[in-house]
Regions:
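Auxiliary, metal-adjacent structural segments of Zn-dependent hydrolase domains
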Residues: 1-96
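Short pre-active-site segment immediately N-terminal to the catalytic Zn-binding motif
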Residues: 98-118
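Catalytic Zn2+-binding segment of zinc metalloproteases
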Residues: 120-137
Length: 144
């Protein structure tokens, strides 16, 4: 599917991939500080530990949401950073961001749009015709 999308739609379309990539990190972050506590502190905190772990996860989620909102202001295409963030087979351009990006460049907007559309189509063609690549790229990020 090829189309122009808004910043909000970019977040919605890429959110499942971001969740896949960030959930392991969120689990590590929420549990890491609890593991570092001395046993006495863990025992004293008792049931509060679980609640504090959940709060840590919520804080991470809030930070991730803010980061995605900022990234949505800067992304030009669905695969801008080289990762297949949108659902398989989805090519997308973000016209508002492209317009902002093109300001001050001494090129016609049509040339910029053609270049970005061709690059996005090339990314999607690569991910479509090399079936294992999408999963391998995402798995590599997850493993890191």
């Amino acid at each position: 599917m090829n189309h122009a999308i808004t910043r909000g739609a970019w977040v919605e379309k890429t959110l499942p991939t971001w969740q896949r990539l960030c959930d392991p990190v969120a689990r590590q972050v929420s549990g890491a500080w609890m593991e570092a506590l001395p046993e006495e502190a863990k025992q004293a905190a008792g049931p509060l530990l679980q609640m504090m772990g959940q709060m840590g996860g919520m804080a991470f989620g809030s930070q991730l949401g803010n980061a995605l909102a900022q990234l949505a202001q800067e992304m030009l295409t669905a695969s801008e950073i080289g990762l297949p963030l949108a659902p398989a087979g989805t090519s997308a351009l973000l016209p508002a961001n492209i317009e902002k990006f093109a300001e001050g460049l001494e090129l016609p907007n049509s040339e910029i749009l053609v270049f970005l559309a061709a690059r996005e189509a090339a990314h999607q063609r690569l991910f479509t015709h090399v079936p294992w690549l999408r999963q391998r790229l995402l798995a590599t990020v997850e493993e890191f």
